[in-house]
A protein has these predicted regions:
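Membrane-embedded alpha-helical bundles of multi-pass transporters/translocases
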Residues: 1-523
Length: 523
């Protein structure tokens, strides 16, 4: 199969599963918003949940796969399946030991951890005590989700992407049920949400066990800390974690500084980030997950010309999707937040605060997605240090910009700093990758980007005028949903039509791929 087709189909599968999960995530946030709004209780939960959830995003969206896939594939090819699975079992036992220890430490040292991540919470306040309690309750999630992402890495190695991509939906369902069913029965309702988190994490791990066993995994009750291949994975994984963690670390810095701002700032950033996570998860993360096994295979076969083509196509595909998405999110930020969440405790003030966060996070969408595509290229070359170094520079820039911008722009300044540092990150990564592998079709990428900005600008005018004419934030929910859907549909139609007229290669490729898949299914 053509590499571009394989990449697009795999990314489409992951993206489709991710879309289902993210839609459930919006329902989850809607339920949480209605129940808890932007109160100190919500702030406490979001701080407590972010600490273990960062582990899922860092490990689950690349770090384990970045280290595991190349080494596991190499062992399978050189020594056979049996040796590869022995290494995997040993790695599982080591990971299990580390995760149990880390979960216990998280629960035990929760007060001190919260002092670091939310210094603006007074230590004697109800807000601080609740955050500590929630962190301790959700500590087991740290264990369960770590094991779940290990399973994801194994399944991705065998090109099984659908199940790992859909498992986050289980977490969202459990959190929804926890809020609706358990919370009303408790004196401290927010603890019902914590129960949902723990249950969701456990199920994400358990549901993947049969799949990895079918692939060939066998549990071996022994640990070899000095195993050469395991140590090799660890050496690759440590810098990989930091390289992929930059975005999440920047978000943690935002949370830390937002705790010094007026109440609700943490919630504004959370909800704004959730909206940006939709296109980031569907397209950026999906393409990043799909591209690593392909690049690793090309490097193993020393097919560097195909590797360059794959990377260039991935970048153009990301730009084709994220440039119009950025314009759309910026122009429709208020209608989107108002329609999706403004009800119950989520009032107009919360909508306006969230819309500001969404505006500034949207500026960095192309960069956020670009990082997910470029970083795996380094990992396929067994280079996990370069992204980590770039990550250090990016995080330092983010901290400096945070301190400069949070004064005049409040929480919006924190979001903007994250976006600018991500843009710096992806530009530097591309520059360093080009030095490593040579030309990547930069002129073609730049020419495509210029056309896409023009087409997206025309689309933006159509979307803005329609929204200005028809959207009323005080109208009935059903009408607002209809208007918002119509507005987005008009944007998609205008963008597609003009892209077709300008003969955009990415659109032409996707249309042909869709037609072939339809013809296959009809045979």
């Amino acid at each position: 199969m053509n590499n571009n087709k394989k990449l697009s189909q795999t990314a489409g599968t992951v993206g489709g599963m991710t879309l289902i999960s993210r839609l459930l995530g919006f329902i989850r946030d809607l339920v949480i918003g209605m129940q808890f709004g932007a109160t100190f209780v919500a702030d406490a939960f979001f701080v407590a949940f972010r600490i273990p959830n960062v582990q899922r995003k860092i490990l689950g969206e690349g770090a384990i796969s970045a280290a595991f896939i190349p080494v596991f594939t190499e062992i399978r090819n050189k020594k056979g399946e049996e040796d590869a699975w022995k290494m995997a079992a040993n790695l599982f036992n080591i990971l299990l030991t580390i995760l149990i220890t880390s979960s216990l430490a998280l629960a035990l040292f929760a007060p001190y951890i919260i002092m670091v991540f939310a210094p603006g919470f007074p230590q004697t306040s109800e807000k601080f005590n609740l955050t500590v309690l929630l962190t301790q309750w959700m500590a087991p999630y740290f264990l369960f989700i770590g094991l779940a992402v290990f399973c994801m890495g194994i399944l991705n190695t065998y090109n099984k992407f659908a199940l790992p991509a859909i498992t986050p939906a289980i977490l969202n369902i459990c959190m929804i049920l926890g809020t609706l069913i358990i919370s009303p029965k408790l004196d401290q309702p927010i603890l019902g949400l914590a129960v949902g988190v723990i249950t969701g994490g456990l199920l994400q791990f358990v549901i993947q066990i049969p799949a990895i066993i079918r692939c060939g995994f066998k549990f071996i009750p022994s640990i070899d800390w000095k195993n050469h291949e395991t140590l090799r994975i660890s050496k690759l994984m440590i810098p990989a974690i930091f390289g992929l963690a930059v975005y999440e670390l920047n978000m943690l810095v935002d949370t830390l500084l937002a705790s010094l701002l007026p109440e609700g700032s943490i919630s504004y950033l959370y909800y704004g980030n959730r909206l940006v996570q939709l296109p980031l998860g569907i397209f950026g993360v999906a393409l990043g997950v799909a591209i690593l096994p392909m690049l690793s295979h090309q490097v193993a076969n020393k097919d560097f010309s195909e590797m360059v083509k794959t990377i260039a196509f991935g970048i153009r595909l990301i730009l084709f999707i994220t440039i119009p998405a950025t314009i759309g999110l910026i122009l429709l930020r208020f209608p989107i937040v108002n329609t999706l969440w403004e009800r119950g405790e989520f009032n107009r003030l919360t909508t306006e605060g969230t819309a500001i966060a969404l505006l500034y996070y949207s500026v960095g969408l192309c960069a956020f997605c670009g990082i997910k595509v470029i970083v795996p290229a380094f990992y396929s070359l067994n280079d996990t240090k370069t992204p980590a170094k770039v990550g250090v520079y990016s995080m330092l820039l983010n901290i400096i910009l945070n301190l400069i911008l949070m004064g005049p722009l409040k929480h919006g300044g924190l979001a903007l700093a994250t976006s600018i540092s991500a843009l710096f990150n992806v530009i530097l990564l591309i520059y360093l990758l080009r030095r490593r592998i040579g030309l990547m079709g930069g002129r073609k990428i730049l020419s495509s980007a210029i056309k896409l900005f023009f087409v997206s600008g025309v689309m933006g005018i159509a979307v803005y005028l329609f929204n200005l004419t028809f959207f009323d934030p005080n109208s009935m929910l059903a009408l607002k949903l209809f208007i918002l859907f119509a507005d987005i549909s008009i944007g998609v139609l205008v963008y597609t039509a003009i892209s077709r007229i300008t003969q955009n290669e990415e659109l032409t490729f996707l249309i042909e791929l869709t037609r072939k898949r339809k013809n296959k299914s009809s045979v």
